[in-house]
Amino acid sequence: MIRILFFASLRERLGEAEVTLAPAPELKTVADVRAALAARTDGRWAELLSVEQLLLAAVNETMAPPETAVQDGDVVAFFPPVTGG
Amino acid sequence: MIRILFFASLRERLGEAEVTLAPAPELKTVADVRAALAARTDGRWAELLSVEQLLLAAVNETMAPPETAVQDGDVVAFFPPVTGG
Amino acid sequence: MTMADTISSDLNSPDGPFWHRIQTAPIDCGAAQQWLSADIVGAAGATVLFTGQVRSEQGQVSALSLEHYPGMSEKVLAGLIREVAQRWPLLRALAWHRVGDMGAGDAIVVVGVAAAHRQAAFEACSCLMDRVKTEVPLWKKVSGPDGSDWVDARDADLAAARRWHDSGEADER
Amino acid sequence: MTMADTISSDLNSPDGPFWHRIQTAPIDCGAAQQWLSADIVGAAGATVLFTGQVRSEQGQVSALSLEHYPGMSEKVLAGLIREVAQRWPLLRALAWHRVGDMGAGDAIVVVGVAAAHRQAAFEACSCLMDRVKTEVPLWKKVSGPDGSDWVDARDADLAAARRWHDSGEADER
């Protein structure tokens, strides 16, 4: 399975902190995972995960651009630009 | 009288922390005071106060370039470049 | 997986030269300064310590809540310290970041370095702080009389962090 | 009139926004940080604290003695703080300098500022420290196994201080 985490405003607006996706041939990259999530028709998934939204991603706790490869067992996280400090 | 103070290595090498000079028509500026001191023939005054030595001066606790006016009652200080901090 | 409410494990330690920490407990800035200055060989001539505190914004901010990505935030913080210490010759460096709930005036973050000379210390501390602001997965939510909302990322912070990329480090990676 | 061995009078005070001090007693850096952070209106988002300490220089320095020009050193220090606070919007600023005898690892000077934003805090603190190094009448003498000698002024320090003149302040005077 691919574990997917959401943080901060994205987590709050989705109403979910975590979902899982079954690995599939069409889920090769971070961009693919995001597109799969944006294809969900329940709730605000399409809006909040659309490519128009400025979101960052990490794969296994390392920042990951959209083309980063994803495989079974990975943890993918999506979140808004960071605002610490 | 004009009070003259010396600090740090200059004080140590002169063997004096303070001298006084009587006001005189030829003692118009900091440079004049320095020249008067350098004219002393006892000890190392000529060497240590010569214009070749890199020294700073203050008049009444304010940094003062050589052309600064000096008058009766002033406190003039000479010292090497500062090394605090 | 919402707000982290545990103090993260310390793989690093006060005994080594680098010390990062994500913590829910209040930050003790005095302790940070003391640790930086305690260089037993006496080779550190300069320390620079930065603290970021919750601003009240004329009463518009009464509380601040900080969420992080547990595990990743510690990892990124540790990596930033290592990178900064490769660019400037540092004897010690620390970065402690608070998460969870805090109020106006509370310290959110403390970042500090010790070096032989002050120029390196100022630059390294400033760089480390700019990168903490833009690279560690942390998110602020502020509460005030009009309710609460997430803070937007500032372009000025991204520009500040880019300064350091333009002048070396990132180019070499 | 040799080594100053009195704590100079405080015309300024911990109750105001600026605090300068020439002191023979050891410097308490934690107290400096605490004072900077204690901004009751919560308007200060950033503090930057610099400390300079006696370096042992691989055992070549066992003790350091600092002479100053009593009266003038306090006056210059106070003036520098005022000038820096005119250039950057500071909520608090302090500069405490130790004089007299100290040993390796002891703090010689602590300079710190509090501001709304970090860029101003870093720049103001760095500028204040560069100017303290080159404008306050203070002189270091170091002692080691080979005897003692006065420290020469460094060109690098003068160059560092000039940076701030070139980019504004001094031009406006």
PLM region spans:
Chain C
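N-terminal, polar/charged subdomain of small-to-medium soluble alpha/beta proteins
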Residues: 2-108, 114, 123-126, 130-173
